[in-house]
């Protein structure tokens, strides 16, 4: 039976971080405390928020870095639409459609070979989540059929209409970053948001998760490791 629960947004002042206190109500299980914590910085100097969801701590934005954790540059293609189908293990990052102005809001897109490179791309103390860790998030939020709505940013500032059942009650703030096919095109900007997992399916494919403007699902899919897909980092435990 579904019950109404109160969720507390606990935002407090700590050294170097200023946060605000309020509370509101939400429906459906599971309920949770949304605690916005002090910021995280990547090797490029990009700053990210972080949020507790169940037993996990997630960044609240997609990764934007152009470097591995050790400072090595991650390659890209010129032009952004270059066909990489025949490359064996391409390691690239892109702004969507080659438009650097989109990076601040939507982050970058990476091939799977980048996100599993031993040099790491998440900030120190963070990692690209496995398929099992995505499933932990999904289950905590009540299952795949409703979890997507709880992750998506509210409204149509970034999402196309109707952005069905978006509540962002988790503070995850999923945005429709689209993705890059292995041939030469960028697709589904403003309609779908997706993120890699570190778990491979076969030698050529890996698991990823998507949310859509037209449903409140979170959908596990299998894509080519050569695709450009966003990354949302998870804190090490």
Task: Kindly give the residue locations of the regions a language model identified.
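Bacterial N-terminal signal peptides that target proteins for export
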Residues: 2-11
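Beta-rich interaction/scaffold domains
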Residues: 2, 26-27
């Amino acid at each position: 039976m579904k019950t109404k629960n109160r969720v507390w947004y606990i935002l407090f002042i700590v050294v170097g971080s200023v946060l605000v206190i309020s509370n509101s109500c939400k429906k459906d299980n599971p309920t949770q405390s949304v605690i916005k914590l002090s910021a995280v910085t990547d090797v490029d100097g990009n700053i990210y928020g972080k949020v507790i969801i169940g037993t996990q701590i997630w960044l609240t934005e997609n990764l934007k870095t152009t470097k591995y954790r050790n400072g090595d540059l991650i390659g890209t293609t010129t032009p952004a639409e270059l066909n990489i189908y025949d490359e064996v293990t391409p390691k690239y990052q892109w702004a969507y459609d080659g438009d650097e102005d989109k990076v601040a809001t939507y982050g970058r897109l990476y091939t799977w070979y980048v996100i599993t490179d031993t040099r790491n791309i998440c900030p120190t103390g963070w990692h690209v989540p496995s398929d099992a860790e995505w499933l932990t998030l999904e289950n905590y939020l009540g299952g795949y059929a409703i979890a997507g709505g709880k992750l998506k940013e509210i409204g149509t500032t970034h999402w196309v209409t109707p952005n069905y059942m978006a509540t962002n009650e988790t503070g995850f703030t999923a945005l429709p970053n689209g993705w890059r096919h292995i041939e030469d095109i960028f697709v589904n900007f403003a309609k779908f948001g997706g993120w890699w997992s570190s778990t491979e399916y076969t030698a050529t494919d890996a698991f990823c998760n998507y949310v859509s403007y037209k449903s409140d699902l979170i959908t596990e899919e299998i894509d080519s490791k050569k695709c450009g897909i966003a990354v949302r980092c998870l804190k090490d435990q």
